[in-house]
């Protein structure tokens, strides 16, 4: 019902109930209509107080994306930054500090893929991380070489050269890699089988399936 959807969207945090606690409380509510003077608390009823496992910050972001398509808590890529740093991937905020022709590696969630018919096979991709956006240019030969990674990725890593024209910065892709598997590390239970056997965590979703696919335009 409506209350359950609000709980799943983490709408009760302002009254001290996080998503998991709110869903637990909502599950105890009756679906039957209650009269005006009925359903009052009874001193004779002792509810069992359970300590539910806390959802991690990353887990909350996953759930936010699953229910509302975005999160105001944090950007998903921020939880992967240490892993990306080990791959020498820099935040998009560093792009303006580079010089034309510098080699760079960036990664982010794909928001747009665009392959205009007038562009002679060139693919334009926009990715976003916790710092901002990066505009990528993928030439036809590179696209054919990395087609599967580009088409299937939610989280894409690109290595290439910086191209600066006035205030506009592009990354000309040399190679593209699908890093969507890293999104799974954001789950509270990395092993999906554990979630099936743990009732208190049955609300968890697969992060790799939650984050939006890029929009495709021609």
Question: What does each model-identified segment do?
Answer:
Residues 97, 103-104, 149:
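Residue-level "contact hotspot" at macromolecular interaction interfaces
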Residues 68, 108, 127, 153, ...:
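Hydrophobic, well-ordered secondary-structure elements that form the walls
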Residues 142-157:
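Short nucleic-acid-contacting surface segments enriched for D/E, G, S/T with interspersed K/R
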Residues 1-97, 161-163, 169-216:
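Sliding clamp-binding short linear motifs
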Residues 116-141:
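OB-fold (S1/OB) nucleic-acid-binding surfaces
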Residues 110, 154-167:
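Flexible glycine-rich surface loops and low-complexity tracts that mediate binding to linear polymers
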Residues 103-117:
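Structural detector for short beta-strands of small beta-barrel domains
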């Amino acid at each position: 019902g409506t209350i359950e959807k609000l709980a799943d969207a983490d709408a009760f945090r302002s009254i001290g109930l996080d998503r998991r606690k709110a869903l637990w409380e909502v599950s105890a509510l009756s679906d039957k209509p209650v009269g005006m003077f009925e359903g009052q608390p009874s001193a004779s009823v002792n509810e069992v107080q359970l300590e539910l496992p806390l959802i991690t910050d990353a887990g909350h972001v996953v759930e936010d994306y699953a229910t509302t398509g975005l999160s105001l808590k944090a950007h998903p890529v921020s939880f992967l930054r240490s892993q990306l740093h080990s791959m020498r991937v820099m935040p998009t905020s560093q792009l303006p500090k580079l010089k034309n022709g510098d080699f760079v590696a960036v990664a982010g969630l794909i928001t747009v893929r665009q392959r205009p018919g007038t562009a002679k096979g060139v693919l334009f991709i926009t990715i976003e991380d916790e710092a901002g956006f990066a505009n990528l240019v993928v030439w036809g030969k590179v696209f054919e070489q990395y087609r599967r990674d580009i088409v299937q990725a939610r989280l894409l890593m690109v290595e290439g050269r910086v191209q600066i024209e006035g205030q506009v910065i592009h990354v000309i892709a040399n190679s593209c890699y699908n890093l969507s598997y890293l999104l799974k590390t954001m789950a509270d239970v990395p092993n999906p089988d554990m979630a099936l056997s743990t009732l208190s965590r049955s609300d968890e979703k697969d992060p790799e399936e939650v984050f939006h696919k890029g929009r495709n335009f021609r």
